[in-house]
Amino acid sequence: MDVFKRYQEQYSKYLNGLFFEEHQRFVKFSAAQFEKSMEKSQKTAQRDERLEAHISSERKSDYAPDYHCSTLTTSPTGEFEYNLLSYLSLTFPIGWLKDETRRAEFEEWVDYLCAQFDVLHGYAGLECILPYDPDEWEPHEYQVATHYYNVMPNCNAYAGLRDYKDAAKSIAWYTILGKSLSMRIEPQVWARLAEQYPEITVKTQANGVSVIKIDELPDVGDAGEPLPLNYQALNEALRPVIKAVPNRLHHLYAAPHFDAVKTYYWTHRWDNPNMKDGVLDPEGKTIKTAPILVENGETVRVPYGGVWQPFNHDGEAVHLEKGKPFPDVPKPEDLLAQTLWRLIGRDDGGTLEVVPSFR
């Protein structure tokens, strides 16, 4: 609630829309309506109920906002099995990057939030901002995020408990790690990063939350250009706490989107087989590959006869014939994706790896 009050006080002249749990839709923003909703939300929290709230520069949910403060909370006592992590997101205009004062203001928000909350993980940086109802815009987010690796796809971040309850999603301009995650990184790794890449800074709050920043301005991570080494080095260093096989990032099944396979590729987009301990081998010629993966579906057929095993949940390896449907096997209830099968043995003796592609 304090975050919402602070955001409203600083940016009220930009705010036009408001959505709290009792509204079920966006309504016109006013200071009076905001105070009324905040009072009701306080009572909601006291009843040990989750809270969803948004204040936005957009009056309606049809457009992407320049300013937005959004949360979906857990219950205060954490009694609900599927709602044990709270989500908080703040949006600011991209034009802030051009203004040194605004960039400092942005960093003040990062420091404030990390000092106020026992953060598990998070990030601050570039994002493809979508309207409140993002499903139809997922193909757009996919196109942007697969071309610019440092622009975060975030339309389903509110559901992070499904995927990221024990690991981080990715690195970013600012990468935020709670104490439980940052302690899993060996001290010598932090020391090596500081020596090799002085533009990577680490600031740790009194509560143990660490903020790792790369450069004064974010690199977009253009996939058509050589990727910045400092991002690749940080990715390598934090790989032990980044989710290796996450859920799918998108809901869609038809248009280009982040299905389970493409989500795996995205998670490993910064990986470089020619980098070791933050140092790129200039003579390295190893081609980046990924395992052969197939997400199950009604029309999906086995592409190669051989031994396949579930990759995104526990399951037994089975032999499957080429052209046959994949079997239906039990999977976790909170897994948005279908079973992601990995080929671990081929009848024809062929390769078990592919060069990852977002096309």
PLM feature spans:
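C-terminal interaction module
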Residues: M1-Y14, Y132-T289
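Short, flexible N-terminal segments of the mature chain
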Residues: D2-E21, V318-E333
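Internal, hydrophobic cores of structured domains that mediate oligomerization or house catalytic pockets
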Residues: Y11-V144
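Amphipathic, interaction-prone secondary-structure segments
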Residues: M38-A64, S180-I185, V189-T204, G306-Q309
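Short, flexible domain-boundary/linker segments around small modular repeats
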Residues: S70-T74, K285-E295
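Short, exposed beta-strand/loop patches in secreted or surface proteins that constitute
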Residues: T71-L72, G78, E199-T204, V318
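Short, surface-exposed beta-strand/loop "edge" segments at domain boundaries and coil↔beta transitions
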Residues: W96-D99, L217-P228, G315-H319, G350-T351
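Compact beta-sheet-dominated domain cores in extracellular/mature segments
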Residues: T289-R359
